[in-house]
Amino acid sequence: MTLTPLAVRPSTETEFDPRPSLAVWKFASCDGCQLTLLNCEDELLEVADRVRIAYFPEATRATVAGPYDISLVEGSITTPSDAERIEQVRAASRILVTIGACATAGGIQALRNAASVHEYLTVVYPHPEYIATLGRSTPIAAHVTVDLQLRGCPIDRHQLLEVIAALLRGRRPRIPTASVCTECKRRGTVCVAVAEGMPCLGPVTQAGCGALCPAFHRGCYGCFGPQDTPNTASLASVLGDQGTDRRDVRRLFATFNAGAEAFRSQGLAAPDAQEVAP
């Protein structure tokens, strides 16, 4: 994707306001990644000064019709109406950025992909015929073209600000693609996997959280999803050699990014795990 400075190309519907337009969309999610934008605190006023927040129901009822220069999309696709709506969002967006584990990998709700959704519906709802749902929870990229993605559950606010700043300047955002292990080394955190034998997904998880969990003496649970070259099979073997029960290894990979293929191969779709097709 070729990026040009957004400041020189405002949406036609907002020509009276020279700022690029920003829209924030929610699909199947908890709202945590949207709230990251509101939690920018000191930087939020500067963001609002540089971009026009045209659509953001979490923050305001005021809306401006598209098209939009930037769309931040949170959540996975779980219903037929979601699948239709994301097509409309894509058509109305110059640049579409997925934010968070739900949007980039299907989220925790992707656990449904390893079971029969029909069975769940008949057990939970007295009239399942009224429930419109898809058999799987899928990331946004499975339905439309995605220009950029931000990992995490929730995303890191500094990365979000970097993406917005980069798009305004027409450059690629500087988002790390190394593993969480590099962040442990930078902050001088003792490796909990080597020193304590704790199960840790740090070697295969993308950096971005600042190695928060290891800093508090617990293993990484992979909320930023797999890094560019994750050897999850090797890590699963090492975890087993350290004494971690195979069922616990599967559970470790089957959390926030259970639908990401590299994690799915050792979690929901592991050779000794039974996956029920929807």
Where are the regions a protein language model picked out?
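Short, hinge-like loop/turn segments at secondary-structure boundaries
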Residues: 113-117
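Short glycine-/small-residue-rich Rossmann-like dinucleotide-binding loops
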Residues: 75-77, 101
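Iron-sulfur (Fe-S) cluster-binding modules
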Residues: 1-72, 82-83, 87-95, 118-278
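Catalytic or ion-translocation cores adjacent to nucleophile or general acid/base/metal-coordination motifs
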Residues: 98
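Short gly/pro/ser/thr-enriched loop/turn and capping motifs at secondary-structure boundaries
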Residues: 102-107
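Short secondary-structure transition/capping segments
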Residues: 109-111, 163
